[in-house]
Amino acid sequence: MNEVKSVGAKYIALTGPTASGKTAAAMAIAQQHDVEIISVDSALVYRGMDIGTAKPTVDELAAVPHHLINIRDPLQAYSAAEFVADAQRLIDDIAARGKLPLLVGGTMLYFKALFYGLDDMPKADPAVRAELASEAAAKGWPALHAELATVDPVTAARLAPHDSQRISRALEVFRVSGQPLSFFHQQNAAKTIADDGREERTEILISLEPQERSWLHHRIAERFDAMLAAGFVEEVKTLRARGDLTPDLPSMRCVGYRQAWELLDAQEARSPGGSFPMDELRDKGIIATRQLAKRQVTWLRSMPQRQIITCDTDQALPLVLQAVAQHIEKSSR
């Protein structure tokens, strides 16, 4: 299952942790090559979530054709399986029109699903998820984390007691299948085929990765400050005011949105109409974004076929453009 799959046409994939400069690099590639961009970002699919997702600007969207952005209402889910189907269709369509598909984003699960296929584990069960959400509301997520530790200690050991999304999925898998989530991960790992010796691929995965974490942390803080200045809290207030969204939805679990929603709830309970704790949101949002970046880097290390470009140097963009040009020349021979 983990042998890299052909998706029909050659393409270029550009990834890296959040705030590593993927959008700027993609736009630079687009200036030199006739590309269409396919977003590989589970947050950018949602309409009305522009500021907190660092969505490409109106000018950027107009300058280069983009796909898989603004395709879902925040009330809807969008799975890795749906992404793979959409991405494969778009790759073939873009290539058929004589253009180069450029996949850009940091949702590593999507990349892994596209490259290697999906894990052979149980599908989501809405009834079980609702049951778990009800139990969590009554007992709290730490209690469900403790339950997980009894049936799947391997998975529980790597999850925080309040990691609701992952605790819910792990317990859901166990209740549906009778097997722990770690069992399916082990089965998948056993099928992994080493990259060495694979046939030459017609795709390339470029990964922007910093040498110094402090550089990335500074960029994350700068970007979150810019989001706050651009009206991120008002964006979350607008989403909450719809009345049909809840903090348990995948859209509202996105980094930044979850923290803002929780603080807005706390403010209303404590002092309706009082001042919003902007400094607290800044701290929580930056910490959560750093944690996201750390998880993304961990995912990247499981993709040995990637071509690493050090992004915290002045040569990052020239090196990306060079790698793209060399790959296009090589694959056209």
UniProtKB/Swiss-Prot annotation:
Pfam families: IPPT
Catalytic reactions of this protein: adenosine(37) in tRNA + dimethylallyl diphosphate = N(6)-dimethylallyladenosine(37) in tRNA + diphosphate
InterPro entries: Dimethylallyltransferase, IPT, P-loop_NTPase
Molecular function via GO: ATP binding; tRNA dimethylallyltransferase activity
Region (Interaction with substrate tRNA): 41-44, 165-169, 253-258
EC number per UniProt: 2.5.1.75
BP-aspect Gene Ontology terms: tRNA modification
Enzyme class: transferase
Record-listed ATP binding positions: G16, P17, T18, A19, S20, G21, K22, T23
Cofactor: Mg(2+)
Gene3D superfamilies to which the protein is assigned, alphabetical: 1.10.20.140, P-loop containing nucleotide triphosphate hydrolases (3.40.50.300)
Keyword tags: ATP-binding, Magnesium, Nucleotide-binding, Transferase, tRNA processing
Binding positions for substrate per the UniProt entry: T18, A19, S20, G21, K22, T23
Site positions per UniProt: Interaction with substrate tRNA: T107, R129
Superkingdom of the organism of origin: Bacteria
Similarity comment: family membership: Belongs to the IPP transferase family.
Complex formation: Monomer.
Function: Catalyzes the transfer of a dimethylallyl group onto the adenine at position 37 in tRNAs that read codons beginning with uridine, leading to the formation of N6-(dimethylallyl)adenosine (i(6)A).
Name of protein: tRNA dimethylallyltransferase
Organism, scientific name: Polaromonas sp. (strain JS666 / ATCC BAA-500)
Gene that encodes it: miaA
